[in-house]
Amino acid sequence: MTDFPSIFVPLVGLVFPAIAMASLSLHVENNKIV
């Protein structure tokens, strides 16, 4: 169980920025289209 947080924390640290980047790029695309 000690290894789970070790893997889970960096995973979230990578997934969260990825989602933020994706939503940001979507907003930029929408602004360019409009």
Swiss-Prot record:
Keywords: Chloroplast, Membrane, Photosynthesis, Photosystem I, Plastid, Thylakoid, Transmembrane, Transmembrane helix. One of its GO terms (biological process) is photosynthesis. It is found in: Plastid, Chloroplast thylakoid membrane. The keyword Methyltransferase does not apply. The chain crosses the membrane at residues 4-24. GO terms for cellular component: chloroplast thylakoid membrane; photosystem I. May help in the organization of the PsaL subunit. This is Photosystem I reaction center subunit VIII. It comes from Oenothera elata subsp. hookeri (Hooker's evening primrose).
